[in-house]
Amino acid sequence: MNDSPIVVRVRLDLSYDGTDFAGWADQPALRTVQGTLEAALARVVRAESLPRLVVAGRTDAGVHARGQVAHLDIPHAAWRRLPSRFRRDEAESLAARLNAVLPSDIIVRAASVAPPGFDARFSATERRYAYRISDAGLSPDPLVRRHVLTYPRALDIGSLEAASRSLTGLRDFCAFCRPREGATTIRDLRELSWRREVSGADAWLVVATVRADAFCHSMVRSLVGAVLAVGDGRRDAEWLSRVASSPKRSPAIAVAPGHGLTLEQVVYPSDAEVARRAAETRGRRTLN
């Protein structure tokens, strides 16, 4: 009796520079991360049907990722054909072959067989983003400028932090989200913090760290855009409180440009818990 699985679920850990992509999601006639990866998979995985990717975070146009995660199901027969003459195992061979055909602005950092029940989107417990800003009109280092927003006004870290504290917690973020049919806008925003770095790759940049269980469409950039208006003195805390409590998306909130934003990390529970987490997440979020 053949007990081999019909498909093998594979986890891909990815990084990409989003500058020249129209976002993650496949779109006709546009260069997207998903479309580029799936085209590479079609070349590497010789299967009758094209493997489809499920991703942890569907990044918008221009948004980058250092720690993106996706999964796909590969037919078992095609999976067994992957090892090369260099005697790599299937996962190592898949990553190496993909990186050989992918453009320079995407890299597969690792490929691995996913634990039972793993879902890149629904098993995740947290996403962490960073938004990088060079304020007061100062030009950022040319080596990082594609990932940094040049902001014309000076920012006050104390004002940014005070404004952000009022937004964290489990709440309805409809004022900061582009509505999608049947999708909830209730999220648990665990951190929205700001710091001015003094050393390292981000030296002299203002960096926002944003963590939540998940984010709805344009939520991170809307949060950043709203808080920036307080941090540069154009708005006050009362204004932010009013727009945050709006029952629908507020036109008063300027969405921050995509190129300053990077998906840094996606967090998952232990292998034994990923299936349970996926089942829980598929249930609609409520405030109860």
Question: Would you name each region that the model predicts?
Answer:
Residues 2-288:
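Structured-RNA-binding interfaces characteristic of tRNA pseudouridine synthases
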